[in-house]
A protein has these predicted regions:
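Active-site-proximal beta-strand elements of phosphoester/diester hydrolases
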Residues: 23-35, 99, 111-116, 150-159
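Acidic/histidine-rich helix-loop elements
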Residues: 28-48, 94, 118-134, 160, ...
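His/acidic metal-ligating clusters that form di-metal
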Residues: 135-157, 164-193, 198, 202-204
Length: 280
C-alpha cells in the first residue's frame, strides 16, 4: 500500500512539474562578423559591450548570427554562465560563420544539439542550397529546463540574402526539422532572415500548417525600435527594416517583445537585437 501511495505521489509531482509555467527571456542577435574594416565598430571594440549587454538583459537563451570562431570563443570566455553550441558553416567545424545557440547553463541543460545545412541535402557540409549565393545553416538545441523538466527546442538561423527560392525552401526545411526533432513540444525559432514580413519566406513560416507565430506581433507588450538592421547607424532611417525575428509555437505565450534601439555612441552591432519574455 505504501509503495502504491509513493508511486501515485511521484506521478502527481511529475505532472505538476510538467504543467508548471516557465518564464524565460529569449533573444536573437546578429553580432556582425569580425571585420577589421569596421573601425571604429570592429569586434575588438564591441565585444565587451556586447557581453555586458547580455549580462544586463539576463537572457536565458539567445541565438547569434555571423559570429566567427574567434567571436564564438570570446563570447564563451566573457559569458561564463552560458554554454554555446554551433559550428562554422563552411566545414562543420571552425571555418565560416556560426549560427550559434547560447543558453544559461544554470537554467537549462542541452539534451541534444546539431546543425543542418539549408540546402537540398541538409547533411551535406558546406553545401549551398537552391539559388543561394552563400552557404547557410541552422543550429538547434533540445533544451531541458532544470527546475521543471520542461523541454523546449531552440533553432537559430541566418537566411541567404539573395536567393528567394532558398529563403522559402529554408523555411520549409526548418519547419520539417522542428517537427522531426521535438514534434508538438514547444519550439522557438530565431534568426536574421534577410527578409521582411512581406516576403514569401516569412509567410511560409507563419501560414504553414505547422504554425509558428511572430513573437513581436502576438506579444502582450512591445517596445523599442521598429527595425533591426541599421548598418552601424548608416542606413537612412526611412529605409531601415525589421529582418530579424523570433517565432514561437502556439503553446508559448509572449509577454513582451522589444527591439533594443541602437545607441550611436555605443553601437552593439549593425543590427539591433530583439528579445522576448516568454511563458512556456
Amino acid at each position: 500500500m505504501r509503495k502504491i501511495l509513493f508511486l501515485l505521489l511521484a506521478i502527481v509531482t511529475m505532472a505538476s512539474c510538467s504543467e508548471e509555467k516557465v518564464n524565460v527571456r529569449w533573444a536573437t542577435f546578429n553580432m556582425r562578423y569580425d571585420n577589421p574594416n569596421d573601425d571604429p565598430n570592429h569586434w575588438g571594440a564591441r565585444k565587451e559591450r556586447v557581453a555586458n549587454y547580455i549580462k544586463e538583459m539576463k537572457f536565458d537563451v539567445f541565438g547569434t548570427q555571423e559570429v566567427l570562431h574567434n567571436q564564438f570563443e570570446d563570447l564563451k570566455a566573457l559569458l561564463p554562465d552560458y554554454e554555446g553550441v554551433g559550428v562554422g558553416r563552411d566545414n562543420g567545424a571552425t571555418e565560416g560563420e556560426y549560427s550559434a545557440v547560447f543558453y544559461n547553463k544554470n537554467v537549462f541543460d542541452a539534451l541534444d544539439s546539431g546543425t543542418f545545412w539549408l540546402s537540398e541535402d541538409p547533411t551535406a557540409v558546406g553545401k549551398m542550397g537552391w539559388d543561394a549565393v552563400c552557404v547557410r545553416i541552422a543550429t538547434w538545441a533540445k533544451l531541458q529546463h532544470k527546475a521543471t523538466g520542461k523541454i523546449v527546442m531552440a533553432v537559430n538561423t541566418h537566411y541567404d540574402h539573395v536567393g528567394q527560392v532558398a529563403q522559402k525552401e529554408s523555411s520549409l526545411l526548418i519547419i520539417r526539422k522542428i517537427k522531426e526533432i521535438v514534434g508538438d513540444q514547444p519550439a522557438v525559432l530565431t534568426g536574421d532572415f534577410n527578409v521582411t514580413d512581406q516576403s514569401e519566406a516569412y509567410n511560409t513560416i507563419v501560414s504553414n500548417e505547422f504554425v509558428l507565430l511572430d513573437a513581436h506581433k502576438v506579444a502582450e507588450k512591445t517596445s523599442g525600435a521598429s527595425y533591426t538592421f541599421h548598418g552601424f547607424d548608416k542606413v537612412d532611417p526611412e529605409k531601415r527594416s525589421k529582418i530579424d525575428f523570433v517565432f514561437v509555437t502556439p503553446q508559448i505565450k509572449v509577454l513582451h517583445s522589444e527591439v533594443t534601439p541602437e545607441v550611436k555612441e555605443a553601437l552593439l552591432s549593425d543590427h539591433n537585437p530583439q528579445w522576448t519574455d516568454l511563458e512556456i
